[in-house]
Amino acid sequence: MNLKKIICWPPLLAGIGAGITIAILGYITYESFLSSTDYGLWLIASFGSTVVVVFGYPSNEFAQPKNVFFGHLLTTLVGIIFVTFFEISFISIGLAVGIATMLMIAFKVTHPPAGGNPIAVMIGGVSFPFLVFPIMAGAITIIIGGIIY
């Protein structure tokens, strides 16, 4: 068995890159000096799907930095607007996801993992600071990891 072939196997490298990036976000969220501050949340569930796209399919349009950053930013903003101005219901959650999807496609920043952000935002009842931590900070961390990869 060729060791170089095993070490350079793309799925292995993608898994390592994804795992390290999520571990970094997890460390910042749970172990770093930021963890007990308002800046401590750097990890959300949709980032798990994001690293699959970024590290597993780096040449895909959905994995490009612009799509990762603005896809997460846009969908989270839609969720925050909905949770701020509308009562949470199956209708408002569905509308938020639909509008977020429409906007990602219209602005050419589609990033499918970000489609879940309005759901998480509305269920969690978060507000505008959520756009910075974890969304922008986490997306930038993933983008940097993807560039290094």
Predicted stretch roles:
Residues 1-73, 77, 81, 86-94, ...:
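Alpha-helical transmembrane segments and their membrane-interface boundaries
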Residues 87-111:
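Internal alpha-helical transmembrane segments of multi-pass membrane proteins
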Residues 58-67, 105-115:
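Membrane-helix interface "capping/anchor" motifs
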Residues 1, 102-104, 122, 136:
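Detector for methionine-enriched segments
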Residues 77-78, 106, 118:
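Active-site beta-strand/loop microenvironment that shapes enzyme catalytic pockets
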Residues 98-102, 117-121, 140:
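Hydrophobic transmembrane alpha-helices of multi-pass, membrane-embedded glycosylation machinery
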Residues 110-111, 115-131:
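Membrane-helix boundary connector in multi-pass membrane proteins
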